[in-house]
Regions:
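Enzymes that bind and transform nitrogen-containing heteroaromatic metabolites
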Residues: 1-135
């Protein structure tokens, strides 16, 4: 599976049971990246997406996603699923928000290599950085 996560400068993902931020252009970019393949997420994340035929919703989405399928992760630790992850795509907000849920960045030091970096302008963020990690 290919996981996509949004993080701040300190790898924060959520605060007080809410996402730190969101961006319309980023959501459109995620949809393009999938190329129509399934995009798995939980019901909380689905609320920010338009109806789309490739979005699959399940609270156990990280268990259901198959090879080559995408997962948008906002509020879970992906470490238990590391063996099944083919690629990690981090979208950096390039700012710091309050956070109490974090991405376990130590995972990236276990054989992951930064392959691509690209910056783009979002709808509510001047600069979002996309980082693609592979093994």
């Amino acid at each position: 599976m290919i996981v996509m996560l949004c993080v701040d400068d300190k790898y924060g993902m959520m605060f007080n049971c809410r996402r730190q931020s969101q961006d319309r252009v980023l959501r459109e970019r995620m949809q393009k990246l999938t190329g129509g393949k399934p995009l798995w997420m939980n019901a909380y994340s689905k609320k920010q997406f338009e109806d789309s035929s490739n979005i699959c919703v399940s609270e156990e989405y990280l268990e259901h996603a198959a090879t080559g399928e995408y997962c948008f992760v906002e509020d879970q630790d992906i470490t238990p699923y590391a063996a099944r992850i083919e690629k990690i795509i981090l979208f950096r907000w390039n700012r710091t928000y309050p956070a109490d849920v974090y991405f376990n960045f130590e995972l990236l030091s276990s054989g992951w290599i930064l392959k691509e970096t690209e910056e783009f302008e979002g709808s509510s963020h001047e600069k979002i950085t996309e980082e693609v990690y592979t093994r």
